[in-house]
């Protein structure tokens, strides 16, 4: 079969037959009319959030979403979670918390091998693990958190099913993690149809690949500006103006560190997280200034837009 014929059949299924080499600008926007927002990952507890808030106010940098407790919400007590929720509410930021830790904290070891990790390493193993992660989500919801990072498409499907049956809250953000490996328009369409409120594709896609993904989905896309050295460490600061133009609405996501496993650990000091968080806010300021200079029509949301799932305390 000719490649052009396959492209035609893909188009009939609602998927671009080629990557978007024309780099057509996106006309989609956030509800407030903005093209992009700022997401900070690795906000590991109240002390780190306090430093983030202090730094963003000094620099007058809006921060809209916090991917938080990446080492696992289980490791924080309810008072820490309440304090975190209170601070985020007062500064009008959405909190997306990471349930767990899960994988490698049970008996499964396949994911710890270089080849075994290719086989759905982020997915929850068995019904018991699904039950535990949902319980962890509800523990955080009960103290006011309304956003959660989902690392398993099966769990996302289950949560949406439970929502429809009235057994899981609907006033939440369900962000699909980069660990699910979304890397094509078909994968992006599946994420949207399963009920993700936003999703994080892999970090090293080209601009034409990204633009093709944007054509098929309306939900916000979470774009890695900078990520772990262990992920290859792609730094895409200077891609930001074009990404805002092509990929709107999008979150620019800042998560540089040596590795996820090493940095998101209860053995890493608050001081290390605080130092890096202040730098992340500085780099967000650079990105906003770069977009203003090169794509002045691409607007960033003000602090605290109304559609965020800000904690309820």
Indicate where each model-derived feature is located.
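Short, glycine/polar-rich helix-capping loops at beta-to-alpha or helix-loop-helix junctions
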Residues: 183-187
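Active-site pocket-lining/capping segments in soluble small-molecule metabolic enzymes
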Residues: 1-145, 150-182, 200, 207-313
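Hydrophobic, aromatic-enriched interface-forming segments
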Residues: 194-197
